[in-house]
């Protein structure tokens, strides 16, 4: 009987320690989320609905940004975590909508998101810490932040690492990276990438919107 009591008490102590560690981990993760959102200007400065003009290139050779319209340019309207229109055509690719949701950081504030801290790594020669988001989406997505600046530096999603740079700010104070380069993983498990990019996007203009343009609103 005494042995059973000792085993019960030992199990209880282990369980309490696990709960305490879990609470501590959750608090540390919450603090990191607060830091990166604060760095971005707070929740009110996270993009939610916007129009942007971009150049998208499927190329393994990095190209310099352009300021003029070319045939590769397109204009889109995005509802973060919602719909995405290219021109007046709704885009049905779920993965790009999830990627944009993460890029906006609003995915970190969704109550359905389970967020866990992941081991630090080096990205673009900079130490980076990571936050993994799951449950709110079908496949987990990893957001990486510069250790020093606390800015978003990369997103790992499915088979690609998307690297962000060339930060800009809207007239209303929303900050965003205007250059994105995508590298497919050679080995996702150990984080190694192919040597050459497979696409790049350059945002030429971005405007936050207060409401959907009339031509995109559902007909009554």
Q: What are the functions of these language-model segments?
A:
Residues 6-17:
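Bacterial N-terminal signal peptides
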Residues 60-66, 89, 190-192:
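Flexible, membrane-facing loop/turn or short amphipathic-helix motifs
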